[in-house]
């Protein structure tokens, strides 16, 4: 159970008091909790604080008060921790109990690639007996939304744990056993010592407290628009006006009654404009003058402008260091939740790329494989013709039906069904990482979100790597996972769905997979906004850093959050025009390849760029409407003189979006985080770790009146959030500079030099910069540099003293049902004042947007680093360095940095107890040389190779696509996933059996060949295995055998949704062809039966007279007419046969398999949709056709009294 743990026993200390103060603005949540724990043991112990973090939160501050000690944390570069004797080394253990070959030192725990994202772990040192510990922790989070547009605030369980009705165990006893059932991921060992404690178990336990505790809760709401209501489904709440509120947009929520301790605390906010985009603004912590002086003291700015002091050069340097100066600039946040509830679901318009990953390892039993076969057949028949699909089986290696996802048509569907029918569990162990890498590196298809369906019954020993891989592609891929049997890894299955916003399903013994599969398919086929992008427009005098930069898709209830770090560069641009507009963003272009973001040339929209943008007034959004790329564009703002910042994260909506421009509280511009802003003396290192102590000057904090023994103040004037130790506390001195006692933060006078503590770097980093892009990787030392006294750096005398407000616009675009949609919202960004006002008060929440924006920017750099590393080993260093810079500057963790605990009173670092995975950051030259030495010389980075293997058991339709280390080119020129050594977990390395050209040619021939076989014959062969079984009648079938009653019929359905009227169809539904045709409402079908009989026997004169006297017509044309051709007659008969067979199939499903409607409802909906689009011949109507099919079973009851009549009113609109 998370919380404050005893290292020796793993037991959680009881919570005595919880005081939660939180703040919501738009979709952003700032939360600070004061948690007091009591040590009821008679013996001291080593304390460990464990705090779970969700996918959209980050820890931004931490302090712990233990008696007279204060423990905080500091962000450190993982690559430098070894050099600093912090004993943090790379690890390959992935959250399970450590393997024998990689032992963990006593008192150590491991975090794999996934756990370090979702767990915050801090060593608090020794806790004395009967001592209380108060922990202050601050987080910034992105809030989820509901389909109605409501914003959901759910308090973390660790801040408000439930209290069981009856607590029988004593305090201090060993922690309760985890609720999970996953022995593979969570282990079954007893936690008799801390070094054997598996932190993954903490995520699977319910957070409880053995007794009631004092609970306080306060939520301040600052909405971008008026609130339509605030409610809590769990508690009675009270709403009061905030003391500083200027309108009804700001209120304070508290609990009206005492907390009951039996449920979580949940608050729902209902905005008055729930489905309109809003832009909110949070100012930086520097004025224009302060930032000017800040720049003049930076080494990269001095070097960059030493030879070239032009305005263009200055703005270029500012642009390259924007990620380092995020706290100093204003941050804009875009919030948007589209209204998809009003979109009428249309299964036939369900677009997507459906990829099925099936575990075919030897652990799959014969029963499980048969269950998967039937479920996969139903799933494939439930897909719509507009989508793409592929099937991949994996074990030690993996095999795919197609080289890439193919369009859903008859030929591809028949081939896939044939492969599924012959699928067996014969592929060895379980290697999930390689097939996932192969899938995720495939190019995305426009308008088709990638939907991954993964079925497994086991576990892997690299769970962290698998989850982190899917997390990195969560913007483009959504995973629906299925766990079969008791041995499945619960953490793996749940994690895959959680990190990608999918869903997880588990099957116990005896359960059916089809209902759960169809349930997930229906979620995936819901209305979706794909290819969502955001385009920002700013004046020419503005530099911006934008996130996100990748396309995404939004399903019902999901929201979009975009960020922009905006820098006013008007002081550095001569003769600038505030009305001139340009577009720029963080995309890959050729224009500023060395910059952290990539501006485009000054340009406006072309006349044919679309008519989506209408006239926009200040502070008003426009209606969402389709865009026509061939129509002219008219903007209220001069677009030809604007600059656009693109973020390839789009969105589309269907409702009007008028709203007034909103910004965050203008009083929130004072300095934040006194602890972080206070400059601290360098920490001196000694050779012996146990005796290392660092002299730290905390007089600054004491002078400012902060009582460290009491912790931060959370309420009233002067309230503050806990913080991190400043980055000025370095382990090494720079050059031979003697340590100095840094004074308190002071206002800078004009001409004074300034060095930002978060940007302080060691001189060692300057020596290892890549030579190809020095300006991007310049890192400052802690040595204060005198600014260059140059008159050219003064502001233009012609410029006005008070800059005008920055007017910008955000354009949100996306695709919905192949229709392009767009919204736009304008906003006003007031520039920072030239002089800081004296009346501004501190705001403890004034960095929330900055934290979330920094987190988003860090993730972008991490993704870019991984992408570059796939292309060439070591080429990703520039993005790793940028991620570390941003992490340290904003006190937001990244995968390349780690939290290190610091005991301020003892003036020393606490021993870290966490063993981190190898992040790959800042690889040394020796490591690079060693890794490059393993590859072929002169051929660059090893790439992935597409291979073909002979398949066993006649499974010739599955092609093996194994990722291999080979110096040859990749399949379809797609770069392979990150360079990694092949181990048993990821499949054994295999030798190439043929040269690259021959292998690629064979692959193209195999996959590129088209089937020219007859569709009816293929379908009959695909269902041969089902039809060969005896089909019991409905009245005679047992509950266990009824599961396959409808499977043979479903297997005959065409990709379009229709059924063919042939012998296979008649055999499946057990109705003779003669009876089907005689009961048909189409005279042509009945006449064809008569004609056939006449061909079989000699006709009598009476029969000839009867036929000639009343000849039936087919759409007004006689079957015996000489003008009608045989081809037209056959086509008409085939069309009528399809119509009749399809409605009969629907009636048969309703009659004979009503108990399984949940499983075949998508199949029936597709068939019904196909019928409704057809033109019914002979003047018949669709209702007549369906009624006749239902009456068929009434007639059959007279013909066969054993048939049970079970009419079900099926409505495809309910699907």
Swiss-Prot record:
It comes from Mus musculus (Mouse). Residues 1-18 form the signal peptide. Residues 595-674, 934-953, 964-999, 1100-1121 are annotated as: Disordered. Glycans are attached at residue 132. Residues 353-532 form the VWFA domain. PANTHER family: VON WILLEBRAND FACTOR A DOMAIN-CONTAINING PROTEIN 5B1, VON WILLEBRAND FACTOR A DOMAIN-CONTAINING PROTEIN 5B2-RELATED. This is von Willebrand factor A domain-containing protein 5B1. The keyword Transport does not apply. The gene is Vwa5b1. The lineage of its organism: Eukaryota, Metazoa, Chordata, Craniata, Vertebrata. SUPFAM superfamilies: vWA-like. Keywords: Glycoprotein, Phosphoprotein, Secreted, Signal. GO terms for cellular component: extracellular region. Its main location: secreted.
């Amino acid at each position: 159970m998370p919380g404050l743990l005893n290292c020796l026993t793993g037991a959680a200390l009881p919570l005595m008091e919880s005081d939660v103060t939180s703040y919501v603005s738009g979709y952003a949540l700032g939360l600070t909790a004061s948690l007091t724990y009591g040590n009821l043991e008679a013996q001291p112990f080593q304390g460990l604080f464990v705090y779970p973090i969700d996918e959209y939160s980050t820890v931004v501050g931490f302090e712990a008060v233990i008696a007279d000690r204060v423990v905080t944390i500091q962000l450190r570069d993982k690559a430098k921790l070894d050099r600093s004797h912090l004993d943090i080394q790379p690890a390959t253990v992935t959250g399970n109990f450590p393997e024998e070959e990689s032992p963990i030192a006593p008192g150590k725990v491991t975090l794999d690639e996934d756990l370090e994202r979702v767990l915050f772990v801090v060593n608090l040192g020794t806790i004395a007996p009967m001592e209380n510990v108060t922990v202050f922790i601050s987080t910034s989070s992105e809030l989820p939304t509901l389909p109605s547009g409501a914003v959901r605030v759910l308090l973390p369980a660790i801040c408000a744990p439930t209290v069981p009705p009856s607590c029988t165990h004593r305090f201090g006893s060993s922690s309760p056993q985890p609720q999970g059932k996953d022995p593979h991921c969570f282990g079954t060992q007893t936690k008799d010592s801390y070094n054997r404690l598996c932190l993954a178990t903490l995520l699977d336990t319910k957070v409880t407290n053995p007794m009631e505790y004092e609970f306080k809760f306060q939520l301040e709401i600052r909405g971008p628009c008026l609130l339509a209501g605030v409610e809590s489904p769990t508690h009675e709440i009270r709403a009061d006006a905030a003391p500083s509120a200027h309108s009804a947009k700001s209120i304070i929520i508290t609990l009206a009654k005492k907390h009951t301790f039996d449920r979580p605390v949940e608050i729902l906010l209902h905005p008055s404009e729930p489905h309109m985009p809003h832009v909110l603004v949070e100012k930086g912590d520097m004025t224009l003058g302060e930032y000017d002086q800040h720049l003049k003291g930076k080494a990269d700015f001095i070097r960059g402008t030493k030879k070239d002091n032009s305005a263009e050069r200055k703005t270029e340097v500012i642009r390259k260091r924007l990620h380092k100066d995020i706290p100093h600039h204003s941050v804009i946040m875009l919030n948007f939740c589209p209204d998809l509830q009003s979109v009428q679901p249309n299964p036939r318009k369900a677009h997507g790329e459906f990829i099925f990953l099936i575990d075919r390892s030897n652990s799959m039993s014969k029963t499980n494989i048969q269950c998967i076969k039937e479920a996969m057949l139903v799933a494939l028949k439930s897909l719509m013709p507009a989508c793409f699909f592929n099937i991949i089986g994996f074990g030690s290696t993996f095999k795919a039906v197609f080289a890439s996802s193919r369009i859903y048509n008859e030929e591809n569907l028949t081939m896939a069904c044939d492969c599924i029918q012959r699928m067996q569990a014969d592929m060895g162990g379980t290697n999930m990482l390689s097939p996932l890498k192969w899938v995720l590196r495939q190019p995305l298809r426009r308008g088709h979100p990638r939907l991954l369906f993964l079925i497994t019954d086991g576990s892997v020993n690299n769970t962290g790597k698998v989850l982190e891989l899917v997390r990195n592609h969560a913007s483009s891929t959504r995973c629906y996972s299925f766990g079969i049997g008791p041995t499945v890894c619960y953490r793996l299955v749940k994690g895959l769905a959680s990190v990608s916003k999918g869903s997880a399903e588990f099957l116990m013994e005896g359960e059916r997979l089809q209902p759960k599969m169809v349930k997930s398919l229906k979620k995936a086929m819901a209305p979706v906004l794909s290819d969502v992008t955001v385009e920002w427009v700013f004046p020419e005098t503005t530099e911006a850093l934008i996130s996100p930069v990748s396309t995404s898709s939004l399903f019902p209830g999901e929201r979009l959050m975009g960020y922009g770090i905006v820098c006013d560069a008007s002081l550095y641009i001569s003769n600038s025009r505030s009305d001139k507009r340009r577009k720029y963003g963080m995309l890959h272009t050729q224009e500023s390849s060395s910059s952290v973001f990539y501006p485009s040339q000054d340009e406006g929209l072309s006349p044919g760029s679309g008519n989506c943008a209408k006239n926009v007034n200040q502070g008003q959004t426009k209606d969402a409407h389709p865009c026509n790329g061939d129509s002219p564009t008219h903007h209220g703002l001069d677009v030809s003189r604007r600059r656009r910042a693109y973020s390839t994260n789009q969105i589309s909506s269907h409702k009007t979006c008028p709203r007034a421009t909103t910004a965050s509280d203008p009083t929130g511009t004072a300095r934040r985080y006194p602890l972080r802003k206070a400059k601290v003396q360098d920490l001196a290192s000694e050779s012996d770790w146990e005796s290392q102590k660092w002299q730290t000057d905390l007089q600054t904090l004491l002078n400012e009146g902060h009582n460290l023994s009491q912790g931060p103040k959370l309420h009233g004037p002067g309230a503050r959030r806990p913080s991190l130790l400043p980055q000025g506390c370095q382990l090494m001195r720079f050059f031979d500079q003697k340590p100095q006692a840094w004074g308190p933060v002071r206002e800078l006078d004009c001409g004074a030099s300034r060095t930002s503590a978060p940007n302080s770097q060691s001189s060692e980093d300057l020596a290892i910069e890549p030579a190809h892009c020095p300006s991007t990787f310049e890192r400052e030392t802690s040595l204060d540099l005198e600014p260059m006294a140059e008159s050219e750096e003064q502001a233009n005398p012609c410029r006005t003293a008070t800059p005008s407000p920055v007017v910008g616009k955000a354009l949100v675009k996306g695709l919905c049902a192949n229709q392009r949609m767009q919204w736009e919202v304008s906003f006003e960004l007031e520039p920072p004042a030239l002089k800081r006002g004296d009346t501004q008060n501190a705001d403890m929440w004034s960095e929330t947007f900055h934290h979330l924006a920094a987190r988003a920017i860090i993730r972008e750099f991490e993704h870019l680093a991984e992408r570059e590393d796939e292309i060439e080993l070591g080429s990703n260093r520039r993005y790793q360095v940028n991620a570390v810079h941003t992490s340290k500057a904003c006190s937001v963790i990244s995968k390349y940095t780690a939290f290190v605990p610091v005991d301020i009173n003892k003036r020393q670092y606490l021993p870290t107890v966490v063993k981190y995975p190898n992040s790959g950051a800042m690889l040394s030259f020796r490591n690079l040389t060693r890794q490059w030495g393993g590859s072929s010389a002169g051929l660059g980075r090893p790439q992935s190779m597409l291979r073909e293997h002979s398949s066993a058991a006649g499974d010739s339709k599955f092609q093996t696509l194994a990722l291999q280390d080979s110096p040859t080119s990749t399949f379809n020129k797609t770069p392979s996933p990150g360079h990694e050594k092949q181990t048993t977990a990821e499949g054994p390395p295999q030798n190439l059996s043929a040269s690259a050209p021959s292998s690629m040619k064979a692959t193209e021939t195999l996959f590129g060949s088209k089937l020219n076989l007859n569709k009816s014959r293929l379908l009959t062969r695909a269902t041969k295995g089902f039809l060969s079984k005896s089909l019991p009648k409905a009245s005679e079938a047992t509950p266990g055998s009824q599961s396959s009653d409808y499977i043979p019929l479903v297997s005959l359905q065409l990709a379009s949704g229709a059924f063919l009227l042939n012998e296979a169809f008649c055999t499946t539904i057990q109705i003779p062809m003669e009876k089907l045709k005689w009961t048909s409402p189409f005279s042509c079908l009945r006449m064809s039966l008569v004609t056939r009989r006449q061909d079989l026997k000699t006709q009598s004169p009476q029969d000839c007279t009867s036929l000639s006297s009343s000849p039936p017509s087919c759409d007004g044309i006689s079957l015996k007419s000489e003008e009608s051709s045989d081809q037209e007659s056959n086509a008409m008969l085939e069309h009528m046969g399809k119509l009749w067979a399809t409605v009969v199939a629907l009636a048969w499903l309703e009659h004979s398999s009503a108990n399984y409607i949940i499983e075949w409802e998508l199949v029936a909906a597709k068939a019904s949709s196909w019928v409704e689009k057809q033109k019914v011949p002979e003047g018949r109507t669709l209702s007549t056709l369906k009624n006749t099919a239902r009456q068929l079973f009434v007639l059959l009851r007279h013909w066969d009294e054993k048939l049970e009549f079970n009419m079900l009113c099926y409505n495809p609109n309910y699907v």
